[in-house]
Amino acid sequence: MAEKRNIFLVGPMGAGKSTIGRHLAQMLHLEFHDSDQEIENRTGADIAWVFDVEGEEGFRRRETQVVADLTEKQGIVLATGGGSIQSKDIRNNLSARGIVVYLETTIDKQVARTQRDKRRPLLQVEDPREVLEKLAEIRNPLYEEIADVIVKTDEQSAKVVANQIIDQLGF
C-alpha cells in the first residue's frame, strides 16, 4: 500500500466491527481505534454509565466529537458505534476522510451475538429483537448510502471477513 488510507467500519451492533477491525488493522499494519472504547477512555466510565447519566443525546454528542477527532488521523482502521451513522456530521466525516466499509449482518445474527452483552444500553429491554429491527429500518439505508464497500459477516470468521475487505479494496 503506497499511501496510508483510513478504513472506517460501519454497521449494526453485533456485526463484528471491533473484532474485524482489529484483524484488519493488524493485517494492514494500521492503527486500530474503536469509537466506543475511545469514549470510555475519555470519560473514564463505561458506555452504560454515560447513557445513564447523560442520556443518549449526551452520548451522541461525545461520539460525534470522538469520530471527528479520530477521522483526522491517517492510517487507521476505525470501528464506529452502530448508532453513529445517524449523525450527519459523522457520515460526512467518514465519507470525506476514508473508505467506508459496511459490515452487514442479519437480525438473527445480531441477537445471537449481543444477547449476553450487558454493555449495550439500547438492548437492555424485554424484547431486544424488536429494538434491533426498528434500528435496522432507520440505520441500514444510512449505512448503504455512505458505504464504499459492503461485506456480509454472517457465518464467517473475523479473519475471513478481514481478508474479503482487503481483497475488495485491492490492498
UniProtKB/Swiss-Prot annotation:
InterPro entries in the record: P-loop_NTPase, Shikimate/glucono_kinase, Shikimate_kinase/TSH1, Shikimate_kinase_CS
Gene3D superfamilies xref list: P-loop containing nucleotide triphosphate hydrolases
Binding site for Mg(2+): 18
Gene Ontology biological-process annotations: amino acid biosynthetic process; aromatic amino acid family biosynthetic process; chorismate biosynthetic process
One term under GO cellular component: cytosol
Transport keyword on record: no
Residues annotated as binding substrate: 36, 60, 82, 139
Keyword Magnesium among UniProt keywords: yes
Pfam entry (one): SKI
Pathway involvement of the protein, from the record: Metabolic intermediate biosynthesis; chorismate biosynthesis; chorismate from D-erythrose 4-phosphate and phosphoenolpyruvate: step 5/7
Residues engaged in binding ATP: 14-19, 120, 156
Xref: HAMAP family: Shikimate_kinase
NCBIfam families, alphabetized: PRK05057.1 (NF003456)
Family to which the UniProt record says this protein belongs: Belongs to the shikimate kinase family.
Quaternary structure and partners: Monomer.
Protein name, per record: Shikimate kinase
Lineage of the organism: Bacteria, Pseudomonadati, Pseudomonadota, Gammaproteobacteria, Alteromonadales
Gene designation: aroK
